[in-house]
Amino acid sequence: MWGFRNSALTLLAGVSLVSLSGAALADGYGGSVKDAPIAEGRKLDLSVTLGGTSDYVFRGISQTFENPAAQGSVDLTYGIFYAGIWASNVDFDDNPKANAEIDLYAGLKPTWGPVTFDLGVLYYAYPSAKDSAAELDYVELKAGYSMASPWIKGLTSGTTLYWSSEYGGDVGEVFTLESAAAYELPQFGIFSPSITGAYGTVYGDWKEGFSVDGTREDEYTYWNVGLALAVEKFTFDFRYWDTDIGNVVGPAVCVSEGLCDERFVFTAKVTLP
Protein backbone atom coordinates (compact mmCIF):
# COMPACT_ATOMS: atom_id res chain seq x y z
CA MET A 1 0.00 0.00 0.00
CA TRP A 2 2.90 2.33 0.43
CA GLY A 3 2.55 3.70 -3.03
CA PHE A 4 -0.32 5.83 -1.82
CA ARG A 5 1.66 7.02 1.06
CA ASN A 6 4.31 8.19 -1.32
CA SER A 7 1.87 10.51 -3.03
CA ALA A 8 1.39 12.34 0.22
CA LEU A 9 5.13 12.80 0.54
CA THR A 10 5.90 13.89 -3.02
CA LEU A 11 2.85 0.52 -1.23
CA LEU A 12 1.38 -1.14 1.55
CA ALA A 13 0.15 -2.49 4.10
CA GLY A 14 -0.97 -5.64 4.31
CA VAL A 15 -5.55 -8.16 3.14
CA SER A 16 -7.71 -9.45 3.74
CA LEU A 17 -9.63 -10.51 0.79
CA VAL A 18 -13.04 -11.83 1.51
CA SER A 19 -12.65 -14.97 3.59
CA LEU A 20 -13.97 -17.54 1.20
CA SER A 21 -14.97 -20.98 2.37
CA GLY A 22 -12.82 -22.76 -0.19
CA ALA A 23 -9.64 -24.09 1.34
CA ALA A 24 -7.38 -22.16 -0.99
CA LEU A 25 -9.02 -18.82 -0.29
CA ALA A 26 -9.12 -19.53 3.39
CA ASP A 27 -5.35 -19.77 3.14
CA GLY A 28 -5.30 -16.13 2.12
CA TYR A 29 -3.90 -16.51 -1.38
CA GLY A 30 -5.13 -14.34 -4.20
CA GLY A 31 -6.33 -11.46 -2.07
CA SER A 32 -5.19 -8.13 -0.79
CA VAL A 33 -4.73 -8.62 2.89
CA LYS A 34 -4.45 -11.30 5.48
CA ASP A 35 -7.47 -13.53 5.32
CA ALA A 36 -9.68 -14.26 8.29
CA PRO A 37 -9.61 -17.87 9.51
CA ILE A 38 -12.63 -20.09 8.98
CA ALA A 39 -14.56 -20.66 12.21
CA GLU A 40 -15.48 -24.25 13.13
CA GLY A 41 -18.35 -24.32 15.60
CA ARG A 42 -18.38 -22.76 19.06
CA LYS A 43 -14.96 -23.80 20.31
CA LEU A 44 -11.71 -21.97 20.89
CA ASP A 45 -9.07 -22.64 18.24
CA LEU A 46 -5.55 -21.27 17.93
CA SER A 47 -3.30 -21.64 14.89
CA VAL A 48 0.15 -20.40 13.92
CA THR A 49 1.28 -19.90 10.32
CA LEU A 50 4.88 -19.41 9.18
CA GLY A 51 5.98 -18.80 5.61
CA GLY A 52 7.97 -16.94 3.03
CA THR A 53 7.33 -15.31 -0.33
CA SER A 54 9.52 -14.26 -3.23
CA ASP A 55 7.86 -10.80 -3.25
CA TYR A 56 5.34 -9.38 -0.79
CA VAL A 57 2.59 -7.96 -3.05
CA PHE A 58 -0.40 -6.05 -1.68
CA ARG A 59 -3.17 -5.02 -4.04
CA GLY A 60 -0.83 -5.38 -6.97
CA ILE A 61 2.10 -3.40 -5.56
CA SER A 62 5.38 -4.79 -4.22
CA GLN A 63 5.92 -4.00 -0.54
CA THR A 64 9.49 -5.31 -0.40
CA PHE A 65 11.04 -3.61 -3.44
CA GLU A 66 10.71 -6.92 -5.32
CA ASN A 67 12.68 -8.77 -2.64
CA PRO A 68 11.67 -11.84 -0.56
CA ALA A 69 9.75 -11.59 2.71
CA ALA A 70 9.40 -13.76 5.81
CA GLN A 71 5.86 -13.74 7.19
CA GLY A 72 3.87 -15.23 10.03
CA SER A 73 0.55 -15.02 11.83
CA VAL A 74 -1.29 -16.16 14.95
CA ASP A 75 -5.05 -16.66 14.59
CA LEU A 76 -7.77 -17.21 17.18
CA THR A 77 -11.36 -18.28 16.46
CA TYR A 78 -14.36 -18.84 18.71
CA GLY A 79 -17.69 -19.51 17.05
CA ILE A 80 -18.26 -16.71 14.52
CA PHE A 81 -15.60 -14.48 16.13
CA TYR A 82 -12.01 -14.29 14.89
CA ALA A 83 -8.93 -12.24 15.73
CA GLY A 84 -5.27 -12.37 14.83
CA ILE A 85 -1.92 -10.75 14.29
CA TRP A 86 0.17 -10.90 11.10
CA ALA A 87 3.72 -9.69 10.44
CA SER A 88 6.13 -9.29 7.53
CA ASN A 89 9.30 -7.45 6.64
CA VAL A 90 8.85 -4.53 4.21
CA ASP A 91 11.09 -2.24 2.16
CA PHE A 92 9.88 1.06 0.68
CA ASP A 93 13.39 2.15 -0.39
CA ASP A 94 13.47 4.78 2.37
CA ASN A 95 10.33 6.49 1.00
CA PRO A 96 9.77 6.43 3.92
CA LYS A 97 12.13 4.07 5.73
CA ALA A 98 10.31 1.09 7.25
CA ASN A 99 11.46 -2.43 8.02
CA ALA A 100 8.42 -4.23 9.41
CA GLU A 101 4.65 -4.33 9.13
CA ILE A 102 2.44 -5.71 11.90
CA ASP A 103 -1.30 -6.04 11.31
CA LEU A 104 -4.00 -6.61 13.93
CA TYR A 105 -7.45 -7.76 12.84
CA ALA A 106 -10.74 -8.98 14.30
CA GLY A 107 -14.26 -9.61 13.10
CA LEU A 108 -17.38 -11.72 12.87
CA LYS A 109 -18.29 -14.36 10.29
CA PRO A 110 -22.00 -15.14 10.58
CA THR A 111 -23.74 -17.41 8.10
CA TRP A 112 -27.15 -17.21 6.47
CA GLY A 113 -28.04 -20.30 4.50
CA PRO A 114 -25.21 -20.94 2.01
CA VAL A 115 -23.76 -17.44 2.46
CA THR A 116 -20.92 -16.55 4.85
CA PHE A 117 -20.49 -12.89 5.77
CA ASP A 118 -17.26 -11.28 6.97
CA LEU A 119 -17.48 -8.06 8.99
CA GLY A 120 -14.15 -6.91 10.36
CA VAL A 121 -11.61 -4.24 11.21
CA LEU A 122 -7.88 -4.17 10.42
CA TYR A 123 -5.10 -2.03 11.85
CA TYR A 124 -1.92 -1.75 9.77
CA ALA A 125 1.12 -0.71 11.82
CA TYR A 126 4.74 0.05 10.87
CA PRO A 127 6.82 0.06 14.06
CA SER A 128 9.81 2.44 14.08
CA ALA A 129 8.99 3.74 10.59
CA LYS A 130 10.42 7.16 9.73
CA ASP A 131 7.03 8.50 8.68
CA SER A 132 6.73 11.88 10.39
CA ALA A 133 5.89 13.56 7.06
CA ALA A 134 2.98 11.18 6.36
CA GLU A 135 1.71 8.60 8.85
CA LEU A 136 1.88 5.04 7.55
CA ASP A 137 -0.37 3.44 10.18
CA TYR A 138 -4.06 3.31 9.36
CA VAL A 139 -7.34 1.53 10.14
CA GLU A 140 -9.55 -0.19 7.57
CA LEU A 141 -13.08 -1.60 7.88
CA LYS A 142 -14.34 -4.42 5.69
CA ALA A 143 -17.68 -6.03 4.84
CA GLY A 144 -17.96 -8.99 2.50
CA TYR A 145 -19.67 -12.24 1.66
CA SER A 146 -18.78 -15.57 0.08
CA MET A 147 -20.68 -18.67 -0.99
CA ALA A 148 -20.18 -22.01 -2.70
CA SER A 149 -21.66 -22.26 -6.17
CA PRO A 150 -24.91 -24.27 -6.28
CA TRP A 151 -24.18 -25.17 -9.92
CA ILE A 152 -20.42 -25.87 -10.05
CA LYS A 153 -19.02 -28.24 -7.44
CA GLY A 154 -15.80 -26.97 -5.86
CA LEU A 155 -16.30 -23.32 -6.87
CA THR A 156 -16.45 -20.61 -4.20
CA SER A 157 -16.69 -16.87 -4.86
CA GLY A 158 -17.34 -13.63 -3.05
CA THR A 159 -16.83 -9.88 -2.83
CA THR A 160 -15.48 -7.58 -0.11
CA LEU A 161 -15.57 -3.81 0.33
CA TYR A 162 -12.76 -2.14 2.33
CA TRP A 163 -12.96 1.43 3.61
CA SER A 164 -10.51 3.72 5.40
CA SER A 165 -11.34 7.24 6.51
CA GLU A 166 -7.62 8.13 6.41
CA TYR A 167 -5.55 5.77 4.29
CA GLY A 168 -1.86 5.20 4.94
CA GLY A 169 0.22 8.23 3.96
CA ASP A 170 -2.47 10.70 5.07
CA VAL A 171 -4.18 10.63 1.65
CA GLY A 172 -7.75 10.79 2.88
CA GLU A 173 -10.68 8.44 2.34
CA VAL A 174 -10.02 5.34 0.21
CA PHE A 175 -12.31 2.49 -0.88
CA THR A 176 -11.23 -0.90 -2.23
CA LEU A 177 -13.71 -3.28 -3.87
CA GLU A 178 -12.39 -6.80 -4.45
CA SER A 179 -13.96 -9.97 -5.86
CA ALA A 180 -12.32 -13.37 -5.55
CA ALA A 181 -12.93 -16.97 -6.53
CA ALA A 182 -11.46 -20.41 -5.88
CA TYR A 183 -11.97 -23.68 -7.71
CA GLU A 184 -10.86 -26.96 -6.15
CA LEU A 185 -9.26 -29.36 -8.64
CA PRO A 186 -9.17 -33.16 -8.35
CA GLN A 187 -6.55 -34.67 -6.07
CA PHE A 188 -3.16 -34.93 -7.79
CA GLY A 189 -0.87 -37.41 -6.07
CA ILE A 190 -0.23 -36.13 -2.54
CA PHE A 191 -1.43 -32.61 -3.46
CA SER A 192 -4.86 -30.99 -3.15
CA PRO A 193 -4.68 -28.36 -5.93
CA SER A 194 -6.90 -25.34 -6.45
CA ILE A 195 -7.02 -22.35 -8.78
CA THR A 196 -7.68 -18.99 -7.13
CA GLY A 197 -7.86 -15.42 -8.33
CA ALA A 198 -8.92 -11.90 -7.40
CA TYR A 199 -9.87 -8.68 -9.18
CA GLY A 200 -10.04 -5.38 -7.33
CA THR A 201 -10.22 -1.63 -7.76
CA VAL A 202 -8.85 1.02 -5.38
CA TYR A 203 -10.63 4.39 -5.30
CA GLY A 204 -9.21 7.55 -3.70
CA ASP A 205 -9.39 11.33 -4.14
CA TRP A 206 -6.54 13.20 -5.83
CA LYS A 207 -7.59 16.35 -4.00
CA GLU A 208 -6.67 14.62 -0.73
CA GLY A 209 -3.32 13.40 -2.06
CA PHE A 210 -4.21 9.97 -3.45
CA SER A 211 -2.68 9.91 -6.92
CA VAL A 212 -1.89 6.98 -9.17
CA ASP A 213 0.22 8.84 -11.74
CA GLY A 214 1.07 12.11 -10.02
CA THR A 215 -1.91 13.90 -11.60
CA ARG A 216 -5.67 13.63 -11.14
CA GLU A 217 -5.88 9.87 -11.75
CA ASP A 218 -7.08 8.56 -8.39
CA GLU A 219 -8.09 4.94 -8.99
CA TYR A 220 -6.40 1.80 -10.26
CA THR A 221 -7.22 -1.87 -10.83
CA TYR A 222 -5.24 -4.97 -9.86
CA TRP A 223 -5.73 -8.68 -10.45
CA ASN A 224 -4.07 -12.05 -9.84
CA VAL A 225 -4.52 -15.71 -10.65
CA GLY A 226 -2.61 -18.67 -9.30
CA LEU A 227 -2.29 -22.36 -8.49
CA ALA A 228 -2.18 -23.47 -4.85
CA LEU A 229 -0.92 -26.94 -3.89
CA ALA A 230 -1.83 -28.13 -0.39
CA VAL A 231 -0.27 -31.16 1.25
CA GLU A 232 -0.66 -31.98 4.93
CA LYS A 233 -0.05 -28.67 6.76
CA PHE A 234 1.91 -27.10 3.89
CA THR A 235 0.71 -24.90 1.02
CA PHE A 236 2.71 -23.88 -2.06
CA ASP A 237 1.34 -21.04 -4.17
CA PHE A 238 2.40 -19.96 -7.68
CA ARG A 239 0.77 -16.63 -8.62
CA TYR A 240 0.69 -14.05 -11.41
CA TRP A 241 0.00 -10.41 -10.42
CA ASP A 242 -0.62 -7.31 -12.54
CA THR A 243 -2.20 -3.84 -12.44
CA ASP A 244 -3.30 -1.21 -14.94
CA ILE A 245 -0.70 1.22 -13.54
CA GLY A 246 2.25 0.02 -15.63
CA ASN A 247 5.66 1.63 -15.04
CA VAL A 248 4.49 5.03 -13.82
CA VAL A 249 7.14 6.40 -11.44
CA GLY A 250 7.23 9.56 -9.38
CA PRO A 251 5.07 11.26 -6.74
CA ALA A 252 2.45 8.54 -7.01
CA VAL A 253 1.82 4.94 -5.94
CA CYS A 254 5.06 3.58 -7.38
CA VAL A 255 8.37 4.93 -6.11
CA SER A 256 10.44 2.92 -8.56
CA GLU A 257 10.01 1.32 -11.96
CA GLY A 258 8.74 -2.24 -11.83
CA LEU A 259 6.93 -2.16 -8.48
CA CYS A 260 3.43 -1.96 -9.95
CA ASP A 261 3.66 -4.02 -13.12
CA GLU A 262 3.29 -7.74 -13.85
CA ARG A 263 5.15 -10.31 -11.76
CA PHE A 264 5.19 -13.95 -10.77
CA VAL A 265 5.28 -14.71 -7.05
CA PHE A 266 6.00 -17.96 -5.20
CA THR A 267 4.81 -18.43 -1.62
CA ALA A 268 5.24 -21.36 0.78
CA LYS A 269 3.81 -21.70 4.27
CA VAL A 270 2.99 -24.14 7.03
CA THR A 271 0.07 -23.91 9.47
CA LEU A 272 0.21 -25.46 12.95
CA PRO A 273 -1.11 -27.37 14.73
Regions found by a protein language model. Give the residues of each.
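Short loop/turn motifs that connect adjacent beta-strands in outer-membrane beta-barrel proteins
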Residues: 33-45, 111-116, 148-156, 169-171, ...
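Outer-membrane beta-barrel translocator domains and adjoining extracellular loop/strand segments
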Residues: 58-65, 93-100, 129-136, 168-174, ...
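Outer-membrane beta-barrel "beta-signal"
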Residues: 231, 258-273
